Structures are given as structure tokens and as C-alpha cells.
Amino acid sequence: MATSLGSNTYNRQNWEDSDFPILCQTCLGENPYIRMTKEKFGKECKICARPFTVFRWCPGVRMRFKKTEVCQTCSKMKNVCQTCLLDLEYGLPIQVRDTGLSVKDEVPRSDVNKEYYTQNMEREIANSDGTRPVGLLGKAPSSSDMLLKLARTTPYYKRNRPHICSFWVKGECKRGEECPYRHEKPTDPDDPLADQNIKDRYYGINDPVANKLLMRASTMPRLDVPDDKSITTLYIGGLGENVTDSELRNHFYQFGEIRTITIVQRQQCAFIQFATRQAAETAAEKSFNKLIINGRRLNVKWGRSQAARGKGEKDGVTESGIRLEPVPGLPGALPPPPVSDEDASTNYFNLAPTPSPAVMNLGLPPPPGVTMPPPPGFGPPMFHTMDPMAPPVPPPMALRPPGQVHYPSQDPQRMGAHASRHGGP
């Protein structure tokens, strides 16, 4: 096989020797004290196939060991991490970033052209200050609305977890808790995220993660401007405990005059009132799904007046615009019982009117010529003509059969009648 005179096999000057890797916060791990091994010219870059210095480390407890996959030249050309190949500024795949910045990839694929392009990029990197990307990425606009909405600045350390144990999936793992791999159910093999390629990630072609993020960006919600022109207040949620009044003012003062800033620490939110409606609309448009302070993505919404909030709750619509469906199975509203005008002032519990029982006045003697009936159980038996079709008359309370007990307190067996069995007097 014919090779060029400047190929990596003979040109050892192109081999890379570095002292520290270019990593993102997620790949580096949450532990600030890590032990990292360095192997000079340990492997060849998976993009340009040049030998480079390989770094290997463990990002945390119960995490898998990670190492650099591409050389620093390829990393600087795309401004990506040497391990995960995600953008260092936004934490997004290269395909998503290039789509948001309208940058077209022009990296050659053949061996000779790739080597020539790499040497030119190394020369450009050496002549730069090292603070900005080189090539087409350095000439692109600084930011994009889509990138600010999709940016993932918070580290996601679960990405460093060990791989799934293939023996456990087959039911043959005998290590138990000492197994360094995860004992979890694998993902669906038909899932497009299960098939990822490092070269597709670097060149931004057919990246399943990028396709998923781009589809999410196309269906991203928008912040509608309220019809009430008197509303000039914005709701800022998810503040946490570190966001202060001055930090909010430093961000929102550029959109217009701020009248008041009210921070509710208990709810971790704030209300920012602007002097004009135009300033509030500009702040909402420029900050919706883009506001990041102290590494926290804040939620921006329009404030609502008390009248609009009460109307929304009455119509079954929440503050976020979600319509609540009625709960099935509940009875409808019952009409109030009919109450006369005389009892309306004293019927506090809306009870049905009942006939008042006859009360015997024991303090006054009966009028002359009137004989009072004896109490129940003390007089002679009274015989009435019974209608065979009439329902039976219920017995009085004292003569009701003992088997009908509706509450535990009505049971005579549980009212201390047999306390002598337990050692009582």
C-alpha cells in the first residue's frame, strides 16, 4: 500500500505529547481529588489515527474508568471533550451545535487530505491565543436561541456509570454485589440510542442523540404574550438558595427600567416588575428557556393578576395552561333541602325538618277532667284493632331485640358488664 512521505508512520513529529487532557465537567467527575494515569503515545486517535497521550482515571465511586479517545488537535478543532465528544460550551452533540450556528462541516475524510488539514489546523491553533475556537467555528456567531434553550450546563454524572453486565442479563453472573458492572435491564435493541458511533458523533452525521435533541427543539413550547396590557411582571422560578437580587437585576436591567424585584425564598421564585410593557416583552423573549444564573436554568413565565388567576381556577385551567378534567364517579351538586323561613335562622346544618316529640310537663298538674296516660310498661295492656295489611309496629326502645347493634358502644358485652371475669370486684 502506497503512503505519503509525511504519513504518521514516518513523521514522528506529528505525534502528540500533552500534560493534561481537555475534558468536560461530567467526564472529569464530581471528586476534585482524582488519580489520573498518563501514557505517552499510548493509542492512536480515533479520528486522525495519530498516536497521542492517553489519560485514564476513575471519575467517582462505583463509576467506570474513563480515558481520552481523540487527540487534542481534533478536540480543539471542534471545541469538544476528548472523551465524550460533546461541546465544551453547551454540552450538546456537534450536529446540534453546528445546526444552531449554521456551520457546515468541511473536515476531509481521506488519509492524505486529513493529514494536510490537520497540519494546517495545528499551525492556526499555535498562532491563536487558545481562548477561542479555530476554523469555521471561530467565525460563527457566538450564540443561538436554539442552543441556549437546549444547553446542558449542569453535569450529569450518571453518564459515568458502569456498563450493563452481559452475564447478569443471561443469568450467569456469580459475582453478586462485587460485580463492577450494572445489574439492570438493558435498553431495547431497536432503540436508535443503543447504536452510537464515535465518528458519526465527531462529524455530525446520523447521530441518534442529536436527532432526538433536534426533534425536541422543533416541538419546544413558546411563551405567549398575555392579552392584558397592564401586566408587566415576569415570574422567575427555580432560583435555589444562591441566586440573589443583584444577580437578577444585573441580567434584566439591559431590557428596560425595573420597578421592583420581589424574591420569595420559601417558594424559590421571584417576581420582576418592569416600568413598561415593551421592556417586559423583550425580557420574556430574550430569557425564556435561556436564562442560566450560577449554573441553574431558571424558569421564566408571565405574571398573572389575581382576577385572571381566579378566573383560570374557576374554569378548570391551571396557571401553566393545563385544563383539568373532572374526576369521574363523583356525584353532582345536590340541591339544598327545603327550609322554611321560620327555621332558616336556626337550622345551621341544613337538616330536614322533623316533628318535635311530645314532651311531658312533669311540673304542672293536668287540667281538670283530663287523665294522663301512664308511662310505657306501667299501665294495663292496651288492645288495638290491627289491620292485617298494615306494617308491624316497631317495639319501643326498651323492648328492642338485643341482636340489633349498630355501633360498638351499643354492645352490652363491651360496656363492663363482665368485668368480674377479669379479676374485678
Swiss-Prot record:
Biased composition (Pro residues): 389-399
CDD domains xref list: RRM_RBM22 (cd12224)
Zn-finger (C3H1-type) residues: 159-186
Domain (RRM): residue spans on this chain: 232-305
Keywords: Cytoplasm, Developmental protein, Metal-binding, mRNA processing, mRNA splicing, Nucleus, RNA-binding, Spliceosome, Zinc, Zinc-finger
Name of one Pfam family that matches: RRM_1
GO cellular component, one term: U2-type catalytic step 2 spliceosome
Span of the signal peptide: none
InterPro entries assigned to the protein according to its UniProt record, in alphabetical order: Cwc2/Slt11, Nucleotide-bd_a/b_plait_sf, RBD_domain_sf, RRM_dom, STL11/RBM22-like_N, Znf_CCCH, Znf_CCCH_sf
One of the GO biological process terms: mRNA cis splicing, via spliceosome
Molecular function terms, GO-annotated: pre-mRNA binding; U6 snRNA binding; zinc ion binding
Region (Disordered) residue spans: 304-331, 384-425
Family named by the database record: Belongs to the SLT11 family.
Record's subunit section: Component of the pre-catalytic and catalytic spliceosome complexes. Component of the postcatalytic spliceosome P complex.
Protein name: Pre-mRNA-splicing factor RBM22
